[in-house]
């Protein structure tokens, strides 16, 4: 008989374990699944291109974010981390997949970009690794958040609260609901019935603008829009089935 639950983290880990093993895309145990996903570098996956997100480039060009410390969540093959490093940002990039990180490191060497890559679950790493404890001037997420089950939003918000500097920016790209969008539009509770626990997140969760504003209501919205559709010959990545959002943490109060 186990009676070991005494914290929120214990409850969250218990809920992680309710999902079928093959449905896991977010814990450290999911690294092997993502390794298989990234094994073929020639696979026609839109975000395998070595191009930065168009919205991220736009934020820099418009002065909405400036060089500083960056935490890139779920960096994959590193395209956005490398772009930011090339502009003088000090970048820590985290991913569950050793294969994705090996690809990112290859790209960084080719580009002459200085990025610190970290392997593991960012929720665990940020709590145990002093180098990832923040504060960060920018937390960037292009495609990580929508692979989290609903209960892990608690961990995500706690991470932002812990590592994002006062006045810092939070840049998010995630699946959009509605026409032309992508991802599951099932309500949160549907993922916790028997079928949902067996099937997992169905490729990722779609979000409405209203749900993003509600989830990140502790931050100030700077911009929230559909990602621009970039042509294949563009130097930028852009797919309109994604939301792009920039939020800012309120600056510390002065006395």
Each language-model region and where it sits:
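Short catalytic micro-motifs in class I SAM-dependent methyltransferases
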Residues: 143-147
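Short, conserved loop/helix-junction motifs that constitute active-site signature segments
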Residues: 162
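Class I (Rossmann-like) S-adenosyl-L-methionine-dependent methyltransferase catalytic domain
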Residues: 1-73, 77-132, 148-159, 168-255
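A conserved beta-strand element that flanks and buttresses the S-adenosyl-L-methionine
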Residues: 140
